[in-house]
Amino acid sequence: MIQQESRLKVADNTGAKSLSVIRVLGGSNRRFGSLGDVVVASVKDAVPGSSAVKKGDVVKAVIVRSTKEVRRTDGSYIRFDDNAAVILRPDNDPRGTRIFGPVARELRDRKFTRIISLAPEVV
């Protein structure tokens, strides 16, 4: 369950290291986000130098890993060791060219197929 002020690791090579959630998109009273949800976030840590994003930038990102377990349709549960997100362009494609770490299969249902194809492991 990702909410306002939650810290997320960045699972791509855009140069950002961590994000702070400003808002979970999808309704005026939406409080929590889960796997596959899009959030508006601020870059809190970034790699120094010429990276795609800088500290203080406001970006859109999709949640790809969450420590809160998510129930699947077959009755199993999936959870990860950290909360992570991938920074998006306005057309919902990833801004980076590489994805680090596993991502959830739920992203395929949410039409983030480009992230699925770049990920080294889909769980």
From Swiss-Prot:
Signal sequence, start to end: none
Role of this protein: Binds to 23S rRNA. Forms part of two intersubunit bridges in the 70S ribosome.
Coiled coil: none
A Pfam family matched in the record: Ribosomal_L14
The keyword Transferase is annotated on this UniProt entry: no
Keyword flag S-adenosyl-L-methionine: no
Gene3D superfamilies: Ribosomal protein L14 (2.40.150.20)
HAMAP family: Ribosomal_uL14 (MF_01367)
UniProt-listed CDD domains: Ribosomal_uL14
PANTHER family in the cross-refs: 50S/60S RIBOSOMAL PROTEIN L14/L23, LARGE RIBOSOMAL SUBUNIT PROTEIN UL14M
Database matches in InterPro entries: Ribosomal_uL14 (IPR000218), Ribosomal_uL14_bac-type (IPR005745), Ribosomal_uL14_CS (IPR019972), Ribosomal_uL14_sf (IPR036853)
Alphabetical UniProt keywords: Ribonucleoprotein, Ribosomal protein, RNA-binding, rRNA-binding
GO terms assigned for molecular function: large ribosomal subunit rRNA binding; structural constituent of ribosome
Organism (species): Tropheryma whipplei (strain Twist) (Whipple's bacillus)
Protein name: Large ribosomal subunit protein uL14
Family recorded in the similarity comment: Belongs to the universal ribosomal protein uL14 family.
Domain of life: Bacteria
